[in-house]
């Protein structure tokens, strides 16, 4: 079973993430940031990851620390659950539309953290959610999961649709990358022999 639970406590946030990479998309989300819960639900459903996230943060100041630290803790949990990466497909990509919006996400479990985030948001906030925090979420994830991640919103007018397609595509790309390949069972997906 590829499951993990990670608890991360700082003076700003207390985060618990539990996940099963081979799940069915069940989720239990309570971050204190409703729009983040909505986006995490997209990862769970489209990634077929069972996901529990509980967070308590200094949201009376700003949502920044909570959103970033959830990304960090999710990255740590994915890295822990995936283990030595033997037998995984390693790469995943997805295109996802939502009405006028279309996004592409490509992920590589390379062991080399890198983020290319290109989303020309049409407004600064979705409700009360600051769209810049989405970059902090993915940067936290990338740095602690050890992945290279390319995120491109190819078109969109509605900022909610833009970001929702990003998170749905991320879930689907993640699902493809961590999927076990029977033909590569027990093998590290790299000519170097390690990732």
UniProtKB/Swiss-Prot annotation:
Keyword Amino-acid biosynthesis attributed: yes
Catalyzed chemical reaction(s): D-erythro-1-(imidazol-4-yl)glycerol 3-phosphate = 3-(imidazol-4-yl)-2-oxopropyl phosphate + H2O
InterPro entries attached to this UniProt entry: IGPD_sf, ImidazoleglycerolP_deHydtase, ImidazoleglycerP_deHydtase_CS, Ribosomal_Su5_D2-typ_SF
Matching PROSITE patterns: IGP_DEHYDRATASE_1, IGP_DEHYDRATASE_2
Localisation: Cytoplasm
Primary localization class, coarse: cytoplasm
Family the entry assigns: Belongs to the imidazoleglycerol-phosphate dehydratase family.
Protein name according to UniProt: Imidazoleglycerol-phosphate dehydratase
GN (gene name): hisB
């Amino acid at each position: 079973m590829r499951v993990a639970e990670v608890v991360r406590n700082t003076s700003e946030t207390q985060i618990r993430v539990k996940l099963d990479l081979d799940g069915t998309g069940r989720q239990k989300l309570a971050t204190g940031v409703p729009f983040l819960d909505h986006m995490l639900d997209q990862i769970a459903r489209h990634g077929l990851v069972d996901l529990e996230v509980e967070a308590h943060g200094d949201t009376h100041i700003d949502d920044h620390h909570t959103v970033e630290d959830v990304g960090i803790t999710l990255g740590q949990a994915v890295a822990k659950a995936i283990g030595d990466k033997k037998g995984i497909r390693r790469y995943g990509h997805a295109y996802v539309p939502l009405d006028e919006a279309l996004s592409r996400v490509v992920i590589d479990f390379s062991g080399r953290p890198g983020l290319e985030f290109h989303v020309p948001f049409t407004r600064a906030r979705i409700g009360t959610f600051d769209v810049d925090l989405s970059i902090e979420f993915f940067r936290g994830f990338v740095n602690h999961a050890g992945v290279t991640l390319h995120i491109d919103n190819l078109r969109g007018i509605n900022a909610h649709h833009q970001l929702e397609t990003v998170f749905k595509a991320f879930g689907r790309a993640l699902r493809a990358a961590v999927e076990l390949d029977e033909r590569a069972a027990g093998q590290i997906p790299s000519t170097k022999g390690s990732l």
